[in-house]
Amino acid sequence: MAASALRGLAVAGGGESSESEDDGWEIGYVDQTSQKLKGQMLPIEEKKEKFKKALTTGDVSLVQELLDSGIISVDATFRYGWTPLMYAASVANAELVRVLLDRGANASFEKDKQTILITACSAHGSEEQILKCVELLLSRNADPNVACRRLMTPIMYAARDGHTQVVALLVAHGAEVNTQDENGYTALTWAARQGRKSIVLKLLELGANKMLQTKDGKLPSEIAKRNKHHEIFSLLSFTLNPLEGKLQQLTKEETICKILTTDSDRENDHIFSSYAAFGDLEVFLHGLGLEHMTDLLKERDITLRHLLTMREDEFTKNGFTSKDQQKILTALKELEVEEIQFGELSEEAKLEISGDEFLNFLLKLNKQCGHLITAVQNIITELPVNSQKIVLEWASPQNFTSVCEELVNNVEDLSEEVCNLKDLIQKLQNERENDPTHIPLREEVSTWNSRILKRTAITVCGFGFLLFICKITFQRK
């Protein structure tokens, strides 16, 4: 008995300095126990390795079998301290995530500030699978605002990797949109940096603040520009204040309005204010979807005025495709007001002027007024009724009001002169009718000429009325 007990102390038979092949360990109680424990440990380690392999390969049935064996816990930790649920989330296996959660896995587990939700949002997989995993974790009360060591939250990872639906889901569960990481990046900044246009649009709709700067003082728009994402740069520069939760882009009419009301081209290399001011060239190209040509044209010192007067060979020389040229030409037609050669009026005013020439002049004048009326109608329709909705940087409204007053005065003068012209023509017509030597013109010609004169007078008066409305509109601003 005593001998047996002594043997249980595992004393080396050959002493501490024994150099025998087996170190002099006696084959007895201790060796038998050690062999027994070794035999038990080996299957556990093998099962753990098999379990990890099943997790990473998505073998759901094997995972369930090993969990049912009771040897491996649902919250067991592997190398680096990861749990089975974290492994499943890292490969975006929604079915495995559901199985583990149903068996009681902790959805709020974290290792070195790395949460399972962050792991799921940054997983390599389809957005559909990632969305399902995130939805499952959120349903088990995973906190969407817990940040990693770099202070990045799940929504930042989702925005960085371009998962639009995941971003929306996180916000719906209380994720903070404007949280900043250690470098001052928000989810919007990450999306702008990586060129995720759909994410940028979604975040702006969800209330992301595009004016939050990084630690080095950069706006999301500037981050996008630095990384050559020019379309996102334009979106972030031309949208309304995103804190209102709305996304509005420049329309064609707003672009035209900007061109008509600006004085000269401006450079945009300064730090942007809350409503970034852009030169005419940038605004014009953006409105036509040609913002990708901005940098090239600016490098060649091509102004908007030069662009609008380019010939076909110049367009080709400067890298414009036929499709781009067509866009610009179409826009020019919409902006074009037909020019009348008023220098010829001195000749037409002579008594030798023919009826056809004079009628042609009246038709041109009438068409000119029609173009002007259409332009004013378009601007009145597109002008925002609320000053908060003004996208572009405007000068003082007093400047616009004073110009409108001058326009109204000019239209009134024009209306008066046209009325004088009408009276003069009517007088001439009456005198000719009373002249016994005059051969009467055909009735239809006389009626048609009278109709043209009436239409011209009505058009001019209508133009004056529209400008009066425009003046009242600006006075309200």
Swiss-Prot record:
Alphabetic keyword roster: ANK repeat, Cytoplasm, Developmental protein, Differentiation, Meiosis, Phosphoprotein, Repeat, RNA-mediated gene silencing, Spermatogenesis
Keyword Cell membrane on entry: no
Any Pfam family hit: Ank
Gene Ontology CC annotations of this record: pi-body
Keyword Hydrolase found: no
Domain SAM, chain residue ranges per copy: 274-336
PROSITE patterns: ANK_REP_REGION (PS50297), ANK_REPEAT (PS50088)
GO-annotated biological processes: cell differentiation; male meiotic nuclear division; regulatory ncRNA-mediated gene silencing; spermatogenesis; transposable element silencing
Job of this protein: Plays a central role during spermatogenesis by repressing transposable elements and preventing their mobilization, which is essential for the germline integrity. Acts via the piRNA metabolic process, which mediates the repression of transposable elements during meiosis by forming complexes composed of piRNAs and Piwi proteins and governs the methylation and subsequent repression of transposons. Its association with pi-bodies suggests a participation in the primary piRNAs metabolic process.
Species: Ateles geoffroyi (Black-handed spider monkey)
Principal place of residence: cytoplasm
Gene: ASZ1
Annotated ANK repeat ranges: 46-76, 80-109, 112-146, 150-179, 183-212, 216-245
Family matches, as CDD domains: SAM_ASZ1 (cd09521)
Xref: InterPro entries: Ankyrin_rpt, Ankyrin_rpt-contain_sf, Asz1_SAM, SAM, SAM/pointed_sf
Top-level taxon of origin: Eukaryota
Name of the protein: Ankyrin repeat, SAM and basic leucine zipper domain-containing protein 1
Subunit structure comment from the entry: Interacts with DDX4, PIWIL1, RANBP9 and TDRD1.
Disulfide bond positions: none
Subcellular location: Cytoplasm
Positions carrying Phosphoserine: S17, S18, S20
